[in-house]
Amino acid sequence: MYKTQMEAAKKGILTKEMKSIAESESIDEKVLMERVASGEITIPANKKHSSLLAKGVGTGLSTKINVNLGISKDCPNVDKELEKVKVAIDMKVDAIMDLSSFGKTEEFRKKLITMSTAMVGTVPVYDAIGFYDKELKDIKAEEFLDVVRKHAEDGVDFVTIHAGLNREAVNLFKRNERITNIVSRGGSLMYAWMELNNAENPFYENFDKLLDICEEYDMTISLGDALRPGCLNDATDACQIKELITLGELTKRAWERNVQIIIEGPGHMAIDEIEANVKLEKKLCHNAPFYVLGPLVTDIAPGYDHITSAIGGAIAAAAGVDFLCYVTPAEHLRLPDLDDMKEGIIASRIAAHAADISKKVPKAIDWDNRMAKYRTDIDWEGMFTEAIDEEKARRYRKESTPENEDTCTMCGKMCSMRTMKKMMSGEDVNILK
């Protein structure tokens, strides 16, 4: 009847995933279906991911957030990463990407997919070296596609594919001076493979074969930005824009096959360039959902890049970005631990929510209004319940207990909420007693 969510939408078929998303997002079912059909909304939902609670990404929907997990050679503890998965899901993330970069990753990936109600993404090129136990240069073009198929068979909902880094883009990169060259891990690997083999990008050259795989499993392609800027100086340069144009062309080819697309974006970028970059992506990539890493608005804050990212993410999402990849305090320094992950998730969720208010996403402001009412009433239990990080709010209150229950240790009886509550109800205001 239909192979993909996009094909169903084009045929006027309301899938169970669409129905669920329309209800949870308070969006009209017909409007949602039209946007899935046009590609403005993507529903990453591999047919084999049975535990998935599908989410939509795109125009008119709440801003989604992704968490990156996975093992590395220096930190190969699978159990620690699986513990992160549990906590991330409890913290209401929308997507989890397995960015494992060491050894045989299949076991972790399969456990992740089984456990995760959130959509799961991967970067198959990371897996190729361990999968084949070969050096990068020795992997054949068709073998990269075979790894993509394996991930699809496992139930991965979306895959990052750096198909826009073709020979033209590589030649342009060589002619343009950058401070940080190529900072995308997958992009740098693909660049190295192309140079070492004097060959075209296998994903660009065999894009139709890639579409065959993704159509069969309804696996979304997240078109990676290999040439994204790795510092403020490199943002919005010719390399970045050239690749974005190519991603727009590949998007149209994918949509012709009813394969869903997400476009990945920067990166590192000054605040005053963010809105223009969002408009460029939406124009050049035909309003496909935009997924950004940050963007980080300054390069000088290692240890605090969850903050630099949240600033950029809020601005970007308010301007039209649909999907934020979280950044943790460990960015540029180490593999994040559990506490780093928690801080990154909270920072990203705050950015997404702030943007949703700006975008007038249905019911977004209601959360803030509930909190405001509880503050006016000095209802501590209500405030804790509505807090984005309830555990931290309760802990801070407990660690610094005031003399009077209707105050905190900042203002005491000079609390404005306490004063106005008493005045509005006709009570006396006593400060000294």
Swiss-Prot record:
Swiss-Prot/TrEMBL cofactor(s): [4Fe-4S] cluster
Binding locations of [4Fe-4S] cluster: 408, 411, 415
Recorded catalytic activity of this chain's protein: 5-amino-1-(5-phospho-beta-D-ribosyl)imidazole + S-adenosyl-L-methionine = 4-amino-2-methyl-5-(phosphooxymethyl)pyrimidine + CO + 5'-deoxyadenosine + formate + L-methionine + 3 H(+)
GO cellular component, one term: cytosol
The UniProt record lists the keyword Iron: yes
Disulphide bridges: none
Gene Ontology MF annotations: 4 iron, 4 sulfur cluster binding; carbon-carbon lyase activity; zinc ion binding
Keyword rRNA processing on entry: no
Pathway: Cofactor biosynthesis; thiamine diphosphate biosynthesis
Pfam families assigned: ThiC_Rad_SAM (PF01964)
Task of the protein: Catalyzes the synthesis of the hydroxymethylpyrimidine phosphate (HMP-P) moiety of thiamine from aminoimidazole ribotide (AIR) in a radical S-adenosyl-L-methionine (SAM)-dependent reaction.
Official protein name in the record: Phosphomethylpyrimidine synthase
Native species: Fusobacterium nucleatum subsp. nucleatum (strain ATCC 25586 / DSM 15643 / BCRC 10681 / CIP 101130 / JCM 8532 / KCTC 2640 / LMG 13131 / VPI 4355)
Gene behind this protein: thiC
